[in-house]
Every structure is written in C-alpha cells, then in structure tokens.
Amino acid sequence: MALNLRKNHPLFKTINDALIDLPTPSNISAWWNFGSLLGICLITQIVTGLLLATHYTADTSLAFNSVAHMCRNVQFGWLIRNLHANGASFFFICIYLHIGRGFYYGSYLNKETWNVGVVLLLLLMATAFVGYVLPWGQMSFWGATVITNLLSAIPYIGQTLVEWAWGGFSVDNPTLTRFFALHFLLPFVIAGITLVHLTFLHETGSNNPLGIPADCDKIPFHPYYSTKDILGFALMLILLVALALFSPNLLGDPENFTPANPLATPPHIKPEWYFLFAYAILRSIPNKLGGVLALAASVLVLFLVPLLHTSKQRSLTFRPISQVLFWALVANLLILTWVGGQPVEHPFIIIGQLASLSYFTIILVLFPLAAVLENKMLNL
C-alpha cells in the first residue's frame, strides 16, 4: 500500500501535525481564534511592509516625502500604507484579546507557551514603536525622543545608553536608519519565535473553556477549526479593509502630518492608542526612574501570572469572585488607555495614579487572595 504523503513526508508531516490532524478540544470557543488571527496579522504586516519598504527612503530629509510620494504616486500605495498602519492596530487588538483569553481560562499554566508569548508581546511592542518613527512626522520624532530618553533614567550608564541608541547627541539620521533596520528585521524574529510558541503549545495541546483535561474528547483540527479560523480571517480582514478605506486616519495623530521639526514640540506628546495604558502608568509616577520601572513592570508582570496562581481550578469559568476581578482589571485598563490620551492636569493625574495602583493591586494581590478564598468556600 502506498504511504500517505501527508503523514510521512518530512516537511508535510510537520504541517499535518500542526494544522490538519492536530487533536483539538471539541469545546473551544471563538476566543481560541485569536492565535491564528495573529498569524494572519503578521503575514499581512510583512507583505504590506515589504511593499512599503521598496518605496521608502530611510533618511531624515527624504523619509516624510517618500511616504507622501507613496500615497500619491505609487499604484495603490495609499491602500498599502493604510492597511499597514491600521494592521498594526488590529495586531494589538488581537494580541490583547488573546492575552485576556489566556488570563481568563488559565492558559498561562502552560508556562513555556505563556512566557514565549510574553516575549512575543515585547517584540511586537518594540516593532510597533520603531515603525511609528519611520514616517518622520512630528509625533514620530518626539515619540522617539521621549521614549528613548527614558533609558537615561538608568543610573550611571543611562546617558551613554541613550546616545548609543541615538547614534549621536539627539534623534537624527543615524537613529532613523537603525530604526528602519530594526523594523525590517523584528517581524521575521517574531515569525521565528511564533514557531517556538506553537511548538510549546503542541507539547501540551490547547486548553479549553472548562479548564479540565480534554484528552477523552478531541477532534481533528481540520476541517472543524480550519473552517472556523477562515471565518475569523474573513471577519477580521473585512473590518481591517473597512477601516483602511473609510476612516484610515481615525486612530492616527494629526500631528504626524507635519514633518518632524526638532525646534517645535507638539502640545501633547502621546503614543498610538495601543501603548496608552503603559504611557498612563509611566506618567502617573512623578519620578523618572520610578516611572520607567513601572512602565516596564506593567508588561513584565505577565511573567509572574503563572507563579501567582493559587486556585485549585484552572479557569475562571466557575469562579465568580475572580471573574468580577477580571472584568474590573479590563475596565481598569480601559480607564488607563483613556487617561493616557488626556493632558497632564487635574483630575486626570489622580485618576491615572489610582488606576495604575489598582492595576498592580488586582494582578499581584487581589487575584491570588480571591483564589484562596474561593478554594475555602468550595472546600477544595
């Protein structure tokens, strides 16, 4: 009998084991779609990014004009640019929902998968930051100046680090050149580490909404979840194209339509919406080093989540007290995002400080305590 090529070919069998014959829990919901949506986001960003890179010039005197030229004179350049800029927003929407899903259903107990995922989040944030600098508008320039300057808060070596990152004594041509190099490189690093993320995931298999072992009831990934994923792709791409065609500048900053000018500071320097929660935490601490540490902690705290799991149950499905805390955390992040976009004045300062404090309190203190309380109440 002829061998089944799909199951025996060295290359095809890897793809088969990951996308076709993969045993998958039969009860996973639409919240499990976001992993594959992130894959589609990455592919979309790499393809549109490569097309943009063919017309972009990484030079301070030419960068802004090269982007304008792309939108005016290149066939469908406006569309490619709008898809790329808004694709970043969709990337972050998907990754935040993906992390929220992992948090809610206890997927972080697959520790290696979770930790690699946090590394992927950090890489994505780095990529988005250096990418935002490339059009060399006002907010690009001042965003780069403010955020790279945070390195100077590091004692003793801070100033040296900043000048090393800048390639000079201010954000200038060397900075733009290296940021373009990094922005080109990092998505491919993300693609590589995504494979590591998947490898670790397939060691244990997917979690499910009940948070219980599902080995007794698994179904093949294809055709069930492949079909479900394609529906997700269609819905997301429809939303992305709608945003890129109807309201491409909705999420951008009008300040970035002005070419970078080192002599004029914009009235409100703020990052893109997906960084506002961290920016609000940074601003809520009146000390520079303290702010930088809080900014780093706001994302790095995710590494601690598996260590703080005190419940005897994996998921929050049957834990109402922790559910209330979870949604309080979501609301808290939305408040931080809103405050991050507001000017630094009363009452936004105190709102930001309280929201920052409650962000860390909920994750580091209240979640572990609530889980212990629930264990007691359920006599576990």
Curated annotation (Swiss-Prot):
PROSITE patterns: CYTB_CTER (PS51003), CYTB_NTER (PS51002). GO terms for cellular component: mitochondrial inner membrane; respiratory chain complex III. This is Cytochrome b. One of its GO terms (biological process) is mitochondrial electron transport, ubiquinol to cytochrome c. Its cofactor is heme b. Heme b b562 binds at H84, H183. Binds 2 heme b groups non-covalently. Heme b b566 binds at H98, H197. GO terms for molecular function: metal ion binding; ubiquinol-cytochrome-c reductase activity. It is a multi-pass membrane protein. It comes from Ficedula parva (Red-breasted flycatcher). PANTHER family: CYTOCHROME B. InterPro entries: Cyt_b/b6_C, Cyt_b/b6_C_sf, Cyt_b/b6_N, Cytb/b6-like_sf, Cytochrome_b, Cytochrome_b_C_euk/bac, Cytochrome_b_N_euk/bac, Di-haem_cyt_TM. The cytochrome bc1 complex contains 11 subunits: 3 respiratory subunits (MT-CYB, CYC1 and UQCRFS1), 2 core proteins (UQCRC1 and UQCRC2) and 6 low-molecular weight proteins (UQCRH/QCR6, UQCRB/QCR7, UQCRQ/QCR8, UQCR10/QCR9, UQCR11/QCR10 and a cleavage product of UQCRFS1). This cytochrome bc1 complex then forms a dimer. Keywords: Electron transport, Heme, Iron, Membrane, Metal-binding, Mitochondrion, Mitochondrion inner membrane, Respiratory chain, Transmembrane, Transmembrane helix, Transport, Ubiquinone. Heme 1 (or BL or b562) is low-potential and absorbs at about 562 nm, and heme 2 (or BH or b566) is high-potential and absorbs at about 566 nm. A ubiquinone binds at H202. It is found in: Mitochondrion inner membrane. The chain crosses the membrane at residues 34-54, 78-99, 114-134, 179-199, 227-247, 289-309, 321-341, 348-368. Belongs to the cytochrome b family. It comes from the Eukaryota. Component of the ubiquinol-cytochrome c reductase complex (complex III or cytochrome b-c1 complex) that is part of the mitochondrial respiratory chain. The b-c1 complex mediates electron transfer from ubiquinol to cytochrome c. Contributes to the generation of a proton gradient across the mitochondrial membrane that is then used for ATP synthesis. The keyword Iron applies.
